[in-house]
Amino acid sequence: MGTTNNTIDGSDQVAQLARSLAAVGELIKKIRPDQWSAPTPCPDWTVRRLVEHLVGMNRVFTALLADEPPPRRNADHTDDDPVGAYRDSAATLQAAFERPGVLERTYRGPLGAATGAERLQIRLYDLLAHGWDLALATGQPVELPDDVAERSLEFVRRQLTEDARPGRFGPAQLVADDAPAIERLVAFLGRPVDG
């Protein structure tokens, strides 16, 4: 990983995570029963599978920060209560990032070594992008923290090389320079943004 933008202190970064987790949690709470099997902008993922991914990634990052093995990939992380599973995984992740020294420490992971602050930024951009996916798939307004999306966009622009895109991200899509930060973020990550 490269260096992080240190213009924001750790407590602000952790507060940004709390706001983002809460915003996505609100989207999940408003999913209607008939929407769980609906398609999403993520190929081959239903709304339920997308929420399983969000819960699973919260648990992966929590395990990584505790130097524990991550949960099984592609497992059903939600059981019969996706809303509760997300809420619990978000609270556990938030608590993990609030521990003293977590942001400064370097952690090993499947994509190499990175500081806790860098791990937090990785979690944020994935969380926000999938929050956008979820809002679109369920017809909800996209009400995600714009300042956090802007910071996430700055981070991925510095970190995501073109050779890292295949299999993970599509090519960057065109979007207006004055579009909301969340739209510029998801377009950079390969999602077409209409409008």
Segments predicted by a language model, with ranges:
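Structured surface interface patches that mediate subunit assembly and partner/cofactor docking
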Residues: 2-23, 30-43, 60-195
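Short, surface-exposed helix/turn micro-motifs that flank interaction/cofactor sites
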Residues: 51-52, 131
